[in-house]
Amino acid sequence: MRPPLILASSSPYRRELLERLRLPFEIVVPAIDETPAPGESPDQTALRLARQKAEKVAAAHAGALVIGSDQVATLDGKQVGKPGDHARALAQLHWMRGRTVTFHSALCLYDGRTGQHQSEDVRTLATFRSLSDEELDAYLHLEHPYDVAGSAKSEGLGIALLERVESPDPTALVGLPLIALTTMLRNVHYPLFA
């Protein structure tokens, strides 16, 4: 019998990705502080937040397998967060155009049966096109990507902002690396094809 599988996320994009695996799961939204710690590298931030999300939900769901995930984008050593509004999104896109941004998509699978966890940071390099101010503004008015790191919803129209993507996992850029996740699930003998 499969243990319960829980996605610790409020992200509709992560939910849609997990649905691709056709596994039964539920969603529980973790309430954690997502502020980067002083001196923390972007990959450390993403890994810490993914683990905190999984552990927070696992504490209330004994015996479950809990998936935590977080994504941090970086350029010039600085974290590129969720813009929140049009003006900040436009500023982000101006800064990133013609440049390569690193997206750290961290994943943590917490096994509530054993208290063990597996973590991985899947890095994606996304090179942005050198688009005009008018094109960037039009994109923002059409897509409203104010809730995603880097203002680029690659699962939608945001893919047109990108010139090149390099990643070991094509789902990592959207925020839930499914290749890494299925490897972790196999490691705990969770049946993927049952």
Swiss-Prot record:
Domain of life: Bacteria
Top class in the EC scheme: hydrolase
Names of the cofactor(s): a divalent metal cation
One cellular component term from this protein's GO annotations in UniProt: cytoplasm
Subcellular location as annotated: Cytoplasm
GO BP of this protein: nucleotide metabolic process
Record keywords: Cytoplasm, Hydrolase, Nucleotide metabolism
The EC number(s) this enzyme carries: 3.6.1.-
Catalytic-site annotation from UniProt: D70 (proton acceptor)
Catalytic activity: N(7)-methyl-GTP + H2O = N(7)-methyl-GMP + diphosphate + H(+)
MF term (GO), any: nucleoside triphosphate diphosphatase activity
Important for substrate specificity (site feature) positions: Y13, Q71, E155
Chief site of localization: cytoplasm
Function noted in UniProt: Nucleoside triphosphate pyrophosphatase that hydrolyzes 7-methyl-GTP (m(7)GTP). May have a dual role in cell division arrest and in preventing the incorporation of modified nucleotides into cellular nucleic acids.
NCBIfam families per the UniProt record, alphabetical: maf (TIGR00172)
UniProt similarity note: Belongs to the Maf family. YceF subfamily.
Name under which the protein is recorded: 7-methyl-GTP pyrophosphatase
